[in-house]
């Protein structure tokens, strides 16, 4: 089996991006160890702090954020970073070529129940000139790499450098990420959906109707039965979609009119959308292709509908949108 470094060499990924991706991979190994130790290391539970989103930070949120910050600061290829756990962008190395956006521990509410969590990351080219928030506000199609690391029964990385989506599995003995799927492909059709049904009454009418039709099964307009899956961690739900197809959504809702969206564009929706598109799937807000959105702020939130291409198209048809054409890639 090829190592991560060997695969990046075969893909002719340049040396600076290769080094950055290896830095992220090495740091994820350390994070995997921290997650695995859990209560034995006293890292479970919450802090008394909130992040900029107003969410109470778990101890491991802070620990993993610091681990990634320290590693990226030591990597001369990184110009700056943005994190779910940082109020503002962080300048790193003046000569760095790349910007890194990340969610250090997605699904951290799962930590205390020993369920799935992961790290999500996005790599963008660093524009010339002074570094500020505007430097990061690039559409998702500008990403030069994106991926996540899932800390489950085995530690797995999903990665794209724009040459399809690959899976790597961390070998326990060698501590190397080994290529275990060189061309992940999402099935175009599916009978599985992932959504937080407890919010159903707050959704827009198109999504309420779409889900209601799925629940009607064989007696409804879809004329087939669907199963629901929900891990409560985007990284876990998207991993399942990449492995066996499905549609995942965190749609617009009016539960809190001031916050109609849940997921963050720059370090959740964009990297996942690129992974999904590179695996043959689609990703939309319901009204706009996610990778085409021009960001307006680093912690911007968006609605997300992604997964099996034909099922995403069907969902979008309920929204009055025809996205049956292939997305254009600059």
Curated annotation (Swiss-Prot):
Protein origin, superkingdom: Bacteria
Residues reported to bind Mg(2+) 2: 103, 106, 268
GO terms assigned for molecular function: fructose 1,6-bisphosphate 1-phosphatase activity; magnesium ion binding
Keywords: Carbohydrate metabolism, Cytoplasm, Hydrolase, Magnesium, Metal-binding
Localization per Swiss-Prot or TrEMBL: Cytoplasm
Any GO BP: fructose 6-phosphate metabolic process
Reaction(s) this enzyme catalyzes, per UniProt: beta-D-fructose 1,6-bisphosphate + H2O = beta-D-fructose 6-phosphate + phosphate
Binding site for Mg(2+) 1: 84, 103, 105
UniProt cross-references to InterPro entries, sorted A to Z: FBPase_C_dom (IPR044015), FBPase_class-1 (IPR000146), FBPase_N (IPR033391), FBPtase (IPR028343)
Cofactor: Mg(2+)
EC number: 3.1.3.11
Residues the record lists as binding substrate: 106-109, 196, 262
Disulphide bonds in the chain: none
Gene Ontology cellular-component terms listed: cytosol
CC cofactor note: Binds 2 magnesium ions per subunit.
Primary location class: cytoplasm
Assembly description: Homotetramer.
Family: Belongs to the FBPase class 1 family.
NCBIfam families per record: PRK09293.1-3 (NF006779), PRK09293.1-4 (NF006780)
Name of the protein in its database record: Fructose-1,6-bisphosphatase class 1
């Amino acid at each position: 089996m090829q190592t991560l470094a060997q695969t990046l060499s075969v893909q002719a990924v340049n040396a600076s991006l290769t080094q950055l991706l290896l830095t992220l991979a090495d740091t994820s190994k350390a994070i995997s160890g921290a997650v695995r130790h859990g209560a034995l290391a006293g890292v479970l539970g919450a802090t008394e702090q909130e992040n900029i989103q107003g969410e109470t930070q778990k101890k491991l949120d802070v620990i993993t954020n610091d681990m990634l910050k320290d590693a990226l600061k030591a990597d001369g290829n990184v110009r700056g970073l943005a994190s779910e756990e940082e109020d503002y962008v962080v300048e790193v190395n003046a000569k760095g070529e790349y910007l890194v956006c990340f969610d250090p521990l997605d699904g951290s509410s799962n930590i205390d129940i020993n369920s799935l969590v992961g790290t999500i990351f996005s790599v963008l080219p660093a524009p010339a000139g002074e570094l500020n928030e505007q430097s990061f506000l690039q559409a998702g199609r500008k990403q030069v790499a994106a991926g996540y690391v899932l800390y489950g029964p085995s530690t797995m990385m999903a990665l794209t450098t724009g040459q399809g989506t690959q899976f790597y599995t961390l070998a326990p003995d060698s501590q190397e990420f080994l290529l275990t799927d060189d061309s992940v492909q999402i099935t175009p059709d599916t009978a599985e959906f992932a959504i937080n049904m407890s919010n159903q009454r707050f959704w827009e009418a198109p999504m309420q109707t779409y889900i209601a039709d799925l629940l009607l099964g064989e007696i409804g307009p879809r004329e087939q039965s669907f199963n629901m899956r929900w891990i409560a961690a985007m990284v876990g739900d998207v991993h399942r979609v990449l492995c066996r197809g499905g549609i995942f959504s965190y749609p617009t809702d009016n539960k809190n009119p001031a916050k109609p969206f849940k997921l963050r564009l720059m370090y959740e929706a964009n990297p996942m959308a690129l992974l999904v598109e590179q695996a043959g799937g689609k990703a939309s807000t319901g009204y706009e292709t996610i990778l085409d959105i021009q960001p307006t702020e680093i912690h911007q939130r968006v609605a997300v509908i992604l997964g099996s291409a034909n099922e995403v198209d069907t969902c979008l048809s309920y929204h009055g949108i025809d996205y049956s054409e292939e997305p254009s890639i600059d």
